[in-house]
């Protein structure tokens, strides 16, 4: 379990979700089951890259199947490794349901759970499907490429204090909310689970900031590739927007 899962940020700006739906853990997924709430399990550190990819695709299949069946699913994650895995699965699920001319969007919110005597804070991605808007052949990469506002998430140092970590997440949340206020949408780029987790928490907090003006914040993740020091690296970008732009 990621020690950064419980950072106390659920008290800042974002509405906390109380789970009322029947929850299925990742290990209990059946291929034909429509799931209301899915708890993502972090992979073990010694897992092979092939097994890691297989696990993400299994999650993506469960998410997309449930979206087709009931239109919505809660994807619950605790810790950066779990959040990163969940976000990647959601990104793949978006491409899966796109074949049926459906689009996937989500809203992250803070959640809590008890593990023994400890209360852990995590992220729930309220993920939903709707009929795709605009031209059916529009690629996500084209939508992302047209967005002029781009934020790059920087990983925090490993020795950073818990308080400084919270401050950095709130700063990022403020930047996201400001970008939304200025241009109604922004792209948040992440490389590595630590930055994906940081961005997810920041978006959840930014929802609270945007809500003050009477709007809500939504997003969808997509894979990106960048050249870093001569090596190709795959990351995640969140396309973030508010219903003010609708």
Spell out what each predicted region is.
Residues 19-23, 31-72, 77-80, 84-96, ...:
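Conserved mixed alpha/beta catalytic, RNA-binding, or beta-rich assembly cores of soluble enzyme
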Residues 4, 10-11, 55, 74, ...:
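Detector for Asparagine
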Residues 102-140, 215-246:
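C-terminal edge-of-domain segments
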